[in-house]
UniProtKB/Swiss-Prot annotation:
The keyword Cell membrane does not apply. GO terms for molecular function: rRNA binding; structural constituent of ribosome. GO terms for cellular component: cytosolic large ribosomal subunit. This is Large ribosomal subunit protein uL22. InterPro entries: Ribosomal_uL22 (IPR001063), Ribosomal_uL22_bac/chlpt-type (IPR005727), Ribosomal_uL22_bac/org-type (IPR047867), Ribosomal_uL22_CS (IPR018260), Ribosomal_uL22_sf (IPR036394). It comes from the Bacteria. The keyword Electron transport does not apply. The gene is rplV. Belongs to the universal ribosomal protein uL22 family. Keywords: Ribonucleoprotein, Ribosomal protein, RNA-binding, rRNA-binding. This protein binds specifically to 23S rRNA; its binding is stimulated by other ribosomal proteins, e.g. L4, L17, and L20. It is important during the early stages of 50S assembly. It makes multiple contacts with different domains of the 23S rRNA in the assembled 50S subunit and ribosome. The globular domain of the protein is located near the polypeptide exit tunnel on the outside of the subunit, while an extended beta-hairpin is found that lines the wall of the exit tunnel in the center of the 70S ribosome. GO terms for biological process: translation. PANTHER family: CHLOROPLAST 50S RIBOSOMAL PROTEIN L22-RELATED, LARGE RIBOSOMAL SUBUNIT PROTEIN UL22M. The lineage of its organism: Bacteria, Pseudomonadati, Thermodesulfobacteriota, Desulfovibrionia, Desulfovibrionales. Pfam families: Ribosomal_L22.
């Protein structure tokens, strides 16, 4: 059986989250949580919250052993971009793009 968790509109660039997401693909949940715990990135904290949620969703399925779960899919998609204006010299304005991410984590039994 598999369980999934999705976090939408997370205020971090998908490129930055993917750096961390590659480290936990295919790993057992306990090992993945340890990796995320000691990774000094903002994306690691966000991914660990989504992973905890996926494990909690798996607990709701009858007959699933939580200790035998492994990370099957970690998908980081681009969400909508917030556009802001940065005033510059001589009346110009630069555009600031504040990117968001949709993070999907799927766990399954080994």
């Amino acid at each position: 059986m598999e369980a999934r968790a999705i976090a939408k509109y997370m205020r971090i660039s998908p490129r930055k989250v993917r750096l961390v997401a590659e480290n936990i693909k295919g790993k057992p949940v306990e090992e993945a949580l340890n990796i995320l715990k000691f990774t000094p990135k903002k994306g690691a904290e966000m991914l660990s919250k989504v992973l905890y949620s996926a494990v909690a969703n798996a607990e709701q399925i009858p007959g699933v052993d939580v200790d035998s779960l492994c990370v099957d899919i970690v998908k980081v998609d681009e969400g909508p971009t917030w556009k802001r204006i940065q005033p510059r010299a001589m009346g110009r304005a630069y555009r600031i793009r504040k990117r968001t991410s949709h993070i999907t984590v799927v766990v399954k039994e080994m």
